[in-house]
Amino acid sequence: MKRLKIFLYLGLVFLAYPSWMEARHIPPIVSTQWLNARIGDPSLTILDVRRVEAYQEGHIPGAINVYAGAWAYKKGVLFNEIPDQAELNETIGAVGISLSSAVVVVGNMDTVREGYQTIRVACTLLYAGLEDVAVLDGGMNKWVKENRPLSQKVVKPIPREFQGRYRTDLFADKAYVKENLGKIILVDVREPAYYSGEKKLDCVARPGHIPGAYNLPTSCAFNSDGTFKTKEELLVIAESVTGAGRDREIITYCDTGQCCPTWHFIMRELLGFPRVRIYDGSMQEWGADERAPVTK
């Protein structure tokens, strides 16, 4: 009987453990020490998403460069939508990345905005079907501060044909959000003044937030030096708005779709929340629809 209980317990643990976490071979957030020890590893792609000028001044040896702006597209009036699958296939294939590649995305952390642009690229690769995608904790700022090796050699990757296995379940559109108001946990990751409607960007038609949304600012995920807070701290912060019911569906949004991938990435990839989506149209799309409710 005791042995049976043990088997039942292990079975429950297995069922509770997200399948995509099993597929990972690298952690979702890697340290500078971890990455430094793997420079030259042919199984690892270092993707530098800074502007080409910054890349040319000095980058992690072996890193390839594709600016973060190449991974988000303007569609109509919306600023930051996921690329069309054919275009994304071309972008990923051009830098020699395959579905089996392990990729560490590296950017700057001079501003919080640069940090979440880096994470958006990581989420885009996950959407395309890669499993081993990570971001460098502290970005190039921490790398340089620690006097780790730099190179000015421009790396020219060998292109390959890429066909993604697209994870459409990672994104939600406006219609889905509307249909499920009151059933899903909406997480507004903007700073409090924008969430409350005290401030708004010019590209957002109406101030305020989607009714029922909780406020979880992107900046809360980071320390003052641009590194992530500890996993334990991030879990406490996430559960302050999601509660202990991690199995409920969670949708993150922001102003234009740039920063909402940050908490999506943290909750899904690091903390193991199984049902987290991004509404990339965000308040830019929602606020422009007069039939979509907004509250302050």
Where are these regions (language model features)?
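Bacterial N-terminal signal peptides that target proteins for export
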Residues: 1-8, 19
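Cleavable N-terminal signal peptides
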Residues: 10, 19-21, 257
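Flexible, polar/low-complexity N-terminal or interdomain linker segments that lie immediately upstream
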Residues: 14-57, 140-206, 294
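Solvent-exposed loop/turn segments at secondary-structure junctions
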Residues: 51-54, 69-73, 109-113, 140-142, ...
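Helix-loop module immediately N-terminal to the HCX5R catalytic loop
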Residues: 73-102, 218-250
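Thiolate-centered catalytic microenvironments shared by cysteine-dependent enzyme domains
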Residues: 82-176, 199, 208, 259-276, ...
